[in-house]
Amino acid sequence: MSIIERLKRALPARLKASTDRSSSFDETERPDIGFVACIEGGVLEAQALLLFESIRLYTGRFRNCSLYALSPRAGYEISTQARRRLDDLEVHYLDTVLNTECPEYGSANRVAAAAHIEGIYSHNILVILDSDTLFLGEPSKFILPPDIDAAVRPVDAKGISTAGTNDPFDAYWRNLCNCCDVDYDEITWSESFIDHKRIKANYNGGLVVVRSELGIMRRWADFFFKSIRQGIRPPSDDYSFRAGAGWVEQAASRLWGSNQAALSLAIWSTTRQVKELPPTYNYPLHLHDHVDRAVAKSVFPKLLHLHYHWLFAEDALSTNPLFLRGGPLSVDQRNWLRSATPLS
């Protein structure tokens, strides 16, 4: 049985139960928020459908918000079954080709997709998501207070971030700032989540929450694609590694992290009203064993949104920490994910 067939069979009863649990929410209380994620043929198709289903099932007052699925690259069409499934979940699907300048880099899809939705749909808040994430609870912090314009999580590890003048990636950040006419010194300092390095603010692109009226997503796309046109890339070695959608080959690995650097510049050139979300959001499940033990003990049972990367693949499912006793899953969620996985 395909993943789409499994999801389709599992959804009706759970959706009814979720509707019953959410009946205390008046429709007028529904936040004006749009959720945006990419979908393409292959494993990304299954991941995106699981994400959208999790929103409809487990996000409380957010469960009826607008959902947008985009296929921004040519040649990555989704299946007819997936189209029907998106219709069942009331997801707006757009297959306009948007990523024409950097199609070798899959992460560029979310940049183009976010800018496109921000430009054509009107929402108070946009939530940009990686497809290999899902929700387990109501993400109440998506309702931004008046003094906050963007909510994000720091990068998991330092990676291509800069720690300052003597850092091997500092020249890249300064060149990027010059390209985008952003003052390097105005970018605040932050700390990476796993390895606790002091770095210029750099955010994980798997979850980005912004006020759409500010145009941060369009600025993100402007900055990123301008840097691509000017050949500004972080120093890198040619190597392949595993990510949520599969193995990242050399052409994409040379650009890895560059879209997130552009995001930081887009945010800090627009506003100083930025909040870092707690680690119950966009939790890096693939790095669970590397999270500070005290933090993991406190946070892991209460996860609201997690980034599982490849851990629902058949070869990784048996060691997926999400299914550990004492973890964040309810009985219903455990059964739901057991019936929906492995993803392929």
Protein language model regions, located:
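Glycosyltransferase catalytic domains, chiefly GT-A lineage
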Residues: S2-S344
